[in-house]
């Protein structure tokens, strides 16, 4: 049968339907189409672990009121970002009702009639608002079982009338809240690096916000595909909002760690650009999203904090000079920050997306 498989034609046919994976599921598909088959799907861990390893949960409450509390939080964030590149945060300042409304708003968008969703379907990279299935559909070796509504929310804030009616208002409200939280976290990360609180903000690390609103429909064969294949994020920092269905795993010491859902938490992770400018002090860890084996669509919202989406950008990034010494020389060459670099960076064959910049 392999000789009769025309992958390019099947990708094109799927894309031109403009209904996404959700459209396939709603139509009653009972088998995962071959374009989604991923030979690397292996939910089992490659080796046993003798200890239970968990991504830490950090309470951010009180960081503005108490120097002692702030110093404690900085120390915990430093440890988490050096060891795991991930942590969950509670008491982060984003109202829980705003988080819930955001999840519900994105669920409403993906639950709309396919003919309504089609109006937003595009692969035009010049558009700030896009809906499609798999940004890298034609480039990746296997498509993932998900659909995405994405929008550039900063530095140029979109107008409400340019966003989908069913979720535009909450997208704007949530982005305001998460931008405030990111400013706080970049202060904490700066202090964790031994720098002044405003250092990373003054490098424009919190300037750009790219919001990816994912829907992971139920998968009839979750052992054949991923919701998101193994990758790192080409951001400075990513803040992730999940519903209660889980699915996120982080690779630590060769072992896949589940990140259990917590309705009150937001997940923070280091992106490749933060690893670069911190000169490997903070680590951008590989992670993946398992296909949804449940009965209801899984929803998540990933906020990527990047420099800018104006292309090309002349801003140059390299290891922060204040972190360097004779004993800690730069590990990366300087690079310009281009909008295309902020797309998800895959690591085929275990090669880091930063390898081409490593000295």
From Swiss-Prot:
Matching InterPro entries: DIOX_N, IPNS-like_FE2OG_OXY, IPNS-like_sf, Oxoglu/Fe-dep_dioxygenase_dom
Cofactor details (free text): Binds 1 Fe(2+) ion per subunit.
GO cellular component terms attached to this protein's record: cytosol; plasmodesma; vacuole
Pfam families: 2OG-FeII_Oxy (PF03171), DIOX_N (PF14226)
Residue ranges constituting the Fe2OG dioxygenase domain according to the UniProt record: 207-308
Domain of life the protein comes from: Eukaryota
Cofactor(s) for this UniProt protein: Fe(2+)
Disruption of the gene: reported phenotype: Plants exhibit a complete absence of 2-hydroxybut-3-enyl glucosinolate accumulation and a decreased resistance to generalist herbivory.
Binding-site residues for Fe cation, renumbered to this chain: 231, 233, 287
Keywords tagged on the record: Dioxygenase, Iron, Metal-binding, Oxidoreductase
Known EC number: 1.14.-.-
Catalytic activities: gluconapin + AH2 + O2 = progoitrin + A + H2O
Function according to Swiss-Prot or TrEMBL: Necessary for the hydroxylation of but-3-enyl glucosinolate to 2-hydroxybut-3-enyl glucosinolate, which is toxic to insects, bacteria and nematodes, inhibits seed germination and produces bitter flavors.
UniProt family annotation: Belongs to the iron/ascorbate-dependent oxidoreductase family.
Entry protein name: Probable 2-oxoacid dependent dioxygenase
Species assigned in the record: Arabidopsis thaliana
Gene label: GSL-OH
